[in-house]
Amino acid sequence: VAGRAGRRESEGVVIIQTSEPDNPVIGWVARGDYEAMVRCELADRHAFSYPPYSRLFQLTMRCEDLTLLRQGALFLADAMRAKFGRRVAGPVAPPIDKIRGQYIVRIMLKIENGRSMARARELLREALAQFGAEKEFKTINIAIDVDAQ
């Protein structure tokens, strides 16, 4: 909405509502100091290996049976952790965890820049093959989003 304020002859007004008024981002935005905000955000992203300093793989798992989905997600996350260690986060349920009768959980994988993406894909395929070999999980669908937003 701020982009629409002040488009005419008179200046517009932007109201920022927050539960954290002392957060530095609020100050930077209020002052229009976007360069400081970007510098801080990029430093945080570098420290925690988030894009643009890494690539993200988001695995979205869906199933009508919540108990089975949880078991399958834990199995796959463990198989991935055996190959990627701390680069694996989850499984976690998204805020809307059921759509069209299917429950949803997600697993995130971070691969730092400079690491071999070909090797990462190979290791991920191995973990998915382990998961696929378990017949009990055949009703669980998995979608992979690389560079998830």
Give the ranges of each region predicted by the language model.
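Accessory helical-bundle/CTD segments and flexible terminal tails appended to RecA-like ATPase motors
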Residues: 3-149
